[in-house]
Amino acid sequence: MAIPPSSAPTSLAEAAAKIAEELAPDLVGVQECDYWLERSGNAHQIADIATSISTPYFAFAPSIIGTPGEKWRKLQASDKRMITNADSATQYEGSYGIGIASKIEVVKWHRLDLGNAPFGAPLLIAGDESGPGKPRMLYIRDEPRLAIAATLAHGYTVINAHLSFVPGYNLRQLN
């Protein structure tokens, strides 16, 4: 099962343009972000968002290598743990994670691995790949979770965290 169920290549650009027009943000945090995955047209999504909203600084931190809900693995010691605007021309293995894009200069990027629940949980899913339909329960195993932080030139640090969906375990990750 592909998550999300559909991936029109223009939807990301349209959403980013709408965000830029309506909110004019200096910084955006993105969760469930793809990097060179087939399901999203092999896009570097946080780089595309950064370009769409005119933010020169961005970073992507993969939580897994591969596609969630399909075939994936945890990061290994040899995997790149942070991909930034400084090294975005290099293509790494397709992955899924979180990112930040900023208009304000980022002086340092940080990554904090939060682990994952040792078990999954049933989730109510509406429909399937063919479209909306009767809701059904599907057992989903938890993926490794993380937080990414940007220390900005003016001294503030902004954090984007993608916590577990498993009740209780997500509260543990906040500690």
Task: Tell me the role of every PLM-derived stretch.
Residues 37, 110, 168:
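Short, solvent-exposed loop/turn elements at domain surfaces
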Residues 68, 116-120, 166-168:
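A short local loop/turn or secondary-structure capping micro-motif enriched for an aromatic residue
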Residues 1-95, 171-175:
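N-terminal, active-site-proximal structural segment of metallo-dependent hydrolase catalytic domains
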Residues 66-71, 109-110, 117:
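Membrane-interface segments of envelope glycosyltransferases acting on lipid-linked substrates or membrane lipids
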Residues 94-108, 112, 118-126, 141-160:
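Beta-strand-turn-beta hairpins that frame and shape the catalytic cleft
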Residues 33, 63, 106, 114, ...:
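Hydrophobic pocket-lining residues within nucleotide cofactor-binding pockets
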Residues 1-14, 122-141, 164-171:
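Acidic/histidine-rich helix-loop elements
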Residues 30, 160-161:
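Conserved beta-strand positions
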